[in-house]
């Protein structure tokens, strides 16, 4: 039997839900993480909220429970607050509410590249070589800025890249080091990071190379990586010029002598490539498009003589 000093189930804090106010300021509007998300205990759940002290401005809140490294997250968040780049959301405060830590950042309207990839798959489309080259040229300056501050994203993948609605620019979301340790999406991190190694700038470039290969092919990383040799398979149907493919292969190199030494070096190499005329999506070359043939024209038959119309005014419709 419970004694008066024992906490009863009724006294346990209720789980957050839509409408709850966090830090007497941010009202939760929608949970954007699936309830069955296996990464939730470590990476937390993502919420959309409105700032009641800023006219209802939208914000993104990440909820980290007791299972997460909250102290490490606080330290990492304070570092990210120093990042001032137009393609990185502004990082706000860190709020403790009950057993949870809430990390606040600026909201960005747009669609993730994972969402774009899935939408195109329904239409049998993938990213074209010109479109990818443009994306890399737009995104690498962000990595140059981060790495110059000795910061690493740590979880670069299509789901953590957003195409912003207002200007079409790519925006980096959900840094993989929010919990103090590295939490990277499977398939995008090099083996050294997946095995617990320290995050390094070249690992962001590796993840960017995997992301590029996924966008070009429409296939997940597991379908593109040989599990024995750990070599990446390049489908022959990829829409990529040889010069672009060469630079993408350098992004994916694990040999320090063969890969890019920095994001700035990768950016210079990609800026030197000619931009294709087309910067839009292309059909998946490995899929057969089934085209519906037009209905055959009817065979000509005998022509009936015209008969005069009797009893119909000009404004009346002809009988069906």
Regions found by a protein language model. Give the residues of each.
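AlphaC helix of the eukaryotic protein kinase fold
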Residues: 65-82
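Activation-segment/catalytic-loop signature of the eukaryotic protein kinase fold
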Residues: 94
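Conserved short submotifs of the Hanks-type protein kinase catalytic core
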Residues: 98-112, 116
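AlphaC helix of the protein kinase catalytic domain
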Residues: 113-126
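Activation segment signature within eukaryotic-like protein kinase domains
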Residues: 135-136
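Catalytic-loop of the protein kinase fold
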Residues: 147-163
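Conserved activation segment of eukaryotic-like protein kinases, specifically the C-terminal portion
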Residues: 180-192
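Conserved C-terminal C-lobe helix
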Residues: 239-254
């Amino acid at each position: 039997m419970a004694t008066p000093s024992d906490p009863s189930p009724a006294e346990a804090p209720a789980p957050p839900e839509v409408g709850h106010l966090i830090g007497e300021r941010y009202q939760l509007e929608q949970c954007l993480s699936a309830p069955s998300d296996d990464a939730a205990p470590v990476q937390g759940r993502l919420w959309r909220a409105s700032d009641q002290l800023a006219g209802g401005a939208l914000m993104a809140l990440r909820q980290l429970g007791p299972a997460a490294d909250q102290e490490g997250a606080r330290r990492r968040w304070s570092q990210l607050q120093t990042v001032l780049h137009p393609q990185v959301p502004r990082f706000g405060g860190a709020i403790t509410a009950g057993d949870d830590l809430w990390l606040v950042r600026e909201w960005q309207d747009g669609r993730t590249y994972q969402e774009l990839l899935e939408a195109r798959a329904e239409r049998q489309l993938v990213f074209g070589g010109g479109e990818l080259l443009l994306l890399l040229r737009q995104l690498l300056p962000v990595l140059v800025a981060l790495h110059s501050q000795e910061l690493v994203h740590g979880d670069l993948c299509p789901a953590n890249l957003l195409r912003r609605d207002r200007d079409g620019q790519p925006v980096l979301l959900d840094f993989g080091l929010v919990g103090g340790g590295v939490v990277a999406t499977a398939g995008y991190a090099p083996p050294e990071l997946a095995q617990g190694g320290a995050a390094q700038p070249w690992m962001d470039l590796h993840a960017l190379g995997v992301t590029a290969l996924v966008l070009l092919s429409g296939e997940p990383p597991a379908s593109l990586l040989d599990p024995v040799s750990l070599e990446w398979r390049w489908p022959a149907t990829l829409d990529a010029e040889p010069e672009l493919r060469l630079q993408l292969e350098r992004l994916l190199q694990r040999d320090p002598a063969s890969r890019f030494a920095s994001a700035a070096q990768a950016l210079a190499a990609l800026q030197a490539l000619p931009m294709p005329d087309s910067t839009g999506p292309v059909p998946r070359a490995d899929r057969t498009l089934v085209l519906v043939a037009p209905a055959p024209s009817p065979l000509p038959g005998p022509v009936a003589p015209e008969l005069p119309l009797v009893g119909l005014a000009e404004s009346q419709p002809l009988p069906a």
